[in-house]
């Protein structure tokens, strides 16, 4: 059989185009996850050192600088290691830093014992003057579940922002499969009301294998392979199942008990499916190493946020994440109480800007989980 040159070129073009798209998407995700890093490095001339970048990061994180870090920033402003176009902003932040560390941060909060302990530990770690009350009237309430709290300055909770990011991306284009468990049935039913064109599948620990194989038509593919094999008992056919072609993306509304089994199960059949979830799918995991089960799952949270969780001593990842969110709340309180507005600051969730009277936007970005990159980073 002769294969035409046109056919070969067509295949090559498709292959190269696919590789280019994958590379482009990967670079976009990397750039999105390094906004804070680029924000800092863009202000420094190439001759500058790592210590300067670290000191500048701490300045924009509203963290307390030691004398050595302050002196380094002042000297770098004079000798040109910091770009002239950023000098005024950095000088302004040095004044903000001095004010933050000479004034008392005042907090009046109503919340659970768990959150009280985290807040006090975070404030002690900040090494600043503070006054915190949990009993006075007119307190600001933080839900026991920090993920479900808007934390005073946000219009939405962290989990609401994640869900909105996922739904805006996934529900408006081609048909997708939404896999949910009984814990998230209410949310799945709410999605069905306005998004009935998508496929929905309820699963549990014991039935997910059969249900997923049926809806993705994996069983049909295996049955055809067995039929072909039956014609020649002596032949051994290597078979890779062909999945439904109209479902390329799966959105999970499940917890860790289901997720740690379901995601690896699907990946064992194909790498072509794009898998999405909020961070809830691994909240109950013990450590970042457990994310190996979720390799290449796309989540609407930056790699940097996830990597920071390894440094916190809590029983599971949810506790680590909640601690990071409360740290962000404290930093925004610092900004408000010291009139730091209309300037970019670096939070655990990423680069953001505080505008007086306006909701703070976390500017979430997607990350395809890569366990090696966060273990190396942490």
Q: How would you name each of these model-derived features?
A:
Residues 2-10, 19-378:
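Extracytosolic ligand-binding ectodomains
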């Amino acid at each position: 059989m002769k294969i035409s040159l046109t056919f070969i070129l067509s295949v090559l073009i498709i292959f190269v185009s696919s590789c280019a798209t994958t590379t482009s998407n990967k670079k976009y995700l990397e750039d999105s996850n390094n906004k804070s890093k680029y924000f800092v490095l863009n202000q420094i001339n190439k001759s500058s050192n790592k210590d300067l970048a670290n000191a500048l990061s701490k300045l924009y994180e509203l963290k307390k600088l030691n004398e050595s870090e302050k002196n380094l920033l002042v000297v770098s402003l004079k000798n040109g290691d910091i770009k002239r176009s950023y000098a005024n902003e950095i000088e302004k932040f040095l004044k903000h830093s001095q004010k933050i560390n000479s004034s008392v941060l005042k907090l009046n909060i109503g919340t659970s014992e768990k959150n009280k302990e985290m807040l006090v530990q975070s404030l002690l770690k900040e090494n600043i003057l503070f006054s915190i009350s949990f009993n006075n009237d007119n307190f600001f309430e933080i839900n026991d579940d920090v993920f479900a709290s808007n934390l005073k300055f946000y219009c939405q909770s962290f989990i609401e922002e994640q869900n909105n990011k996922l739904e805006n991306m996934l529900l408006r284009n081609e048909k997708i499969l939404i896999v949910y468990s009984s814990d998230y049935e209410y949310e799945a039913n709410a999605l069905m009301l306005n998004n009935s064109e998508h496929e929905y599948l309820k699963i549990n620990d014991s039935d997910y294998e059969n249900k997923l194989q049926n809806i993705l038509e994996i069983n049909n593919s295996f049955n055809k392979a067995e039929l072909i094999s039956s014609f020649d008992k002596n032949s051994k056919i290597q078979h890779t199942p062909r999945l439904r072609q109209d479902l390329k993306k799966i959105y999970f509304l499940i917890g860790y008990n289901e997720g740690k089994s379901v995601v690896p199960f699907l990946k064992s059949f194909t790498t072509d499916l794009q898998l999405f979830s909020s961070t809830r799918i691994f909240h109950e995991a013990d450590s970042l190493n457990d994310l190996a089960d979720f390799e290449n799952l796309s989540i609407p949270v930056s790699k940097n946020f996830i990597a920071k969780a390894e440094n916190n001593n809590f029983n599971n990842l949810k506790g680590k994440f909640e601690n990071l969110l409360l740290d962000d709340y404290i930093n925004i309180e610092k900004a408000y109480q010291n009139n730091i507005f209309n300037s970019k600051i670096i939070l655990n969730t990423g680069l953001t800007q505080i505008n007086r009277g306006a909701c703070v936007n976390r500017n979430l970005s997607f990350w395809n989980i890569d366990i090696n990159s966060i273990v190396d980073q942490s």
